[in-house]
Amino acid sequence: VQVSIGKCNHNPSDQWLDNISRWSNDRMPIDSIGIDLGLQTTQPYSINDTFKIGSPIGGMIYLRFDTTFTNSFYVTFYNVGRASIINYNITMNEEWNSVLKNAPGNVAEIRTPGNRLVFTSRHIRNLEDAQYISDYWLKAISISNYAVTLENIPITLNFDQRVDAGAAVAFVDRWFTQHPSDWASGCVNKEGLINSGNWGPLHEMNHHMQGPYLRGGNWGIKEPGEETNNVMTSINYILYTNIAGHRNQGLSGWNYVSDGYSTIYKILNGENDQPHLRSYVNIAHAFGTDTLIALVKSYYGLWYENNYEGEYSIKRDSTSAFCLLAAIATKRDTRYLCSLFKYDIQQNVSEAIKNMNYPTYYPFFNVYAMSYNGNYYGRTYKIPYGTTRLNFTATTAIDPSATSVSYTIKSGLTKGKLEQVEENVYDYTPNFGADENDTFVLNIDCIVNGEKVHIEQDGTFELDPHQVEYEVYKDVKTKDMEQALNTIQNKTSNYTGTSTFFDIGNYDDGTMQSMLVEKGKLIVPTSGYYTLFMKADDLGRLLLNVNGEYEQLLNVKTYLGGYSKTINGTYATVKLEKDTEYPFILYNLNTGGQGFIRIGYCYQGTDQSSVNVSKCSVLDIGSSMILNEKVKAGAKEPEF
């Protein structure tokens, strides 16, 4: 019997990264300290055997014993300190916030049935909703536990500063994974998990379905080891995040899996971008995550029960296997779907799918929508406070060869002004508030391969309070800011644009001088002193209303491509209060060619004497810190 203290239940000699022997309070303690109790399993145990153990690094306590020893025994630990540990369904928010989150020690844990996260406690000190976080990680592991009914292995996620992003790895036979330390904060960030997800840790965690204890744990097309995890992680993104709720800003990286349109439009446009994952995930958007899980289960159940490999002479990781199992799970003819992905289907498999007599599945999606023929897969769509041009032709992922294409607004959009501009194109101006929405039903009709296709999609519009508007005044014919301000007085702008940051993004005016004016409100997450910075091409000015009237805060007089801590006028420090809205006006004068303007910030704390601009790490002000000027004071957008 051995007791180990530290970050996991392995000795240093068992670790794969054992070439660094130092540690500090800024990182995880190096591996574990093992304490041999000197007992042999052949000897009888006395209830009075007592041992003193301890460690300068603190951490969790683990018992290890020879697996040949099968008799039961009991161990009691005394004088164990309280630590920053969150136990699922045990640790309540009241106890967490009053005692546990500030408990001593530099190691913290989240424990749920099936997984465990271990990292430096500094990552968890600001967490408030411990119950949400433990519930999230239980749900995360439960997806694959349910989808794969064979032996699933409990997994520990370790976050260590020695591990680079490219070195994140899962050791399933050791029941643990290694992650970069900077991934840890995202695992306990409630807002981040909801709005951005956390692909890396989820991916490594889902390796627990594979390994020497799980024969046949790999499945999928050609890359079974990775496909397994990516499909499971995609289900998490669809079910438990609001990533798709921000698709009006575009979805980058892996985030496309959260939305039906974003998953399929590249394939329909002929792009060969991650086709294997997209071929699985689009099924969840059309038929539900339960159907996709049923498809996964069929790789374990139906595949072996019916001996499909012997019956059809196909391999489990072949495209023919996918097309066959997908047809069974969806009760649809998947031959058209597989043709979109350029998948080969063996002739006998193609005939088998045809003989099932299922209707053909056509994966066509509109970006505004959140349902497919009654299956609600998505999220509401954010629109700005002003007029939105709804172009259903441009925003629908559909077969380019489809004919007789029509888009019909069957019902809805009654809480705003809807004006038809041309066929399938409308201008929609909402007249509801930030805490309301407007719904619609869209019919998509077309002909593909001689077959009539009808798809009904529901959608919901919500206002995006964090999307600000700016006006563009063209041909101001001056390179002087004061003259430009005089020129645009009492004039109507040529057109308007929107931004989701405290900026006006890159644009090109050619040889023309133009003036851009953006209005909104600034909000900050924490009270204290903020140093604001400006960079602009070419000239910029910021007016901020802090004390009841607008005052000029920043002024860039010539092109400035990066934030400066030394040029007067390009930075200023102000004291701002949390949950207070500060109106602003941002001016950008472009003297021709490329143009942009952006505001950054550095939080300096609550003590004015500690303000030090030279030590600032400047960050761009993002969407969470700005509001549209039309947002009513105190209005709250619907919670996810």
From Swiss-Prot:
Peptidase M60 domain segment(s): 1-288
PA14 domain ranges (all copies): 463-615
Chain ranges passing through the membrane: none
Name under which the protein is recorded: Antigenic protein NP1
Native organism: Entamoeba histolytica
